[in-house]
Amino acid sequence: MNFSALRRNLLVGSLSLALSAGLLGQAVAGEQLQKIKDAGEIKIGLEGTYPPFSFVDESGKLTGFEVEFSEALAKELGVKVKLQTTPWAGILAALESKRLDAVVNQVTISEERKKKYDFSEPYTVSGIQALVLTKKADELNIKKAADLDGKKVGVGLGTNYEQWVKAEVPGAQVKTYDDDPTKFQDLRVGRIDTILIDRLAALEYAKKAKDTTVTSEAFSRQESGIALRKGEPELLAAVNKAIEKLRADGTLKKLSEKYFSADVTQ
């Protein structure tokens, strides 16, 4: 075989391999959505300790805005929902390891996170909020981000709140937490001065816990979306279509007003 013939055969072989790889890629891309449909359920991760988004009520039932949103989402996808309560520190790792199909847990959409995960269109809009004990509000006088300088600030480990305060207020004394109950307990006993959480959660918490109050307007706008693994475009498209349907038929707004007495979905 001469060199030209050999080169031609190699080229044909390479093109065949590329075509096969492309077809395989298309098959894999749609595989997860089909797996979910075949199983008849979608595994969604949330904390279950983050009222009013997800929490256990007095009867022992898991409920909340994101619980009902997940149920409605699954219904639009034509499957049942399997809710798996998972601590925040490990919830995205559970998604990566395929123990979860999606995370619905106020995951803020950021450029850094978009490098690792795909996100649905936003389903809530909020901001970073400081929460303090009411009796210390005047003394702490937190009105803007710079006022956190020198303060003992509690944040969830690995959250956008941790990233934000370390970047924007390097003089803050940041303490990280794996769970919310410990964080709020430390606020009450004085181990920290303030907590940074989602504005919507802060307003709801302060409404129920009269010894706490929000200190100012939100420090920054943030949008939350459903986190999915990279490389599942058909699942992402199906999720976005479901969200658009829930927005159009008023379901999202209805759930928002039920838990927040306002439309926080846009």
Task: Describe each PLM feature range.
Residues 68-76, 136, 152, 156-160, ...:
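Extended ligand-binding regions for polar small-molecule ligands
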Residues 71, 75, 80-147, 213, ...:
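Acidic, polar ligand-binding/catalytic clefts
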Residues 40-46, 143-158, 173:
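Short loop->beta-strand "edge-of-pocket" segments that line small-molecule binding or catalytic clefts
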Residues 125-132, 199, 203-244, 260-266:
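Periplasmic-binding protein-like
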Residues 67, 83-93, 140, 175-185, ...:
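Short helix-initiation/N-cap motifs at beta->coil->alpha
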Residues 31-106, 249:
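Extracytoplasmic small-molecule ligand-binding "clamshell" domains
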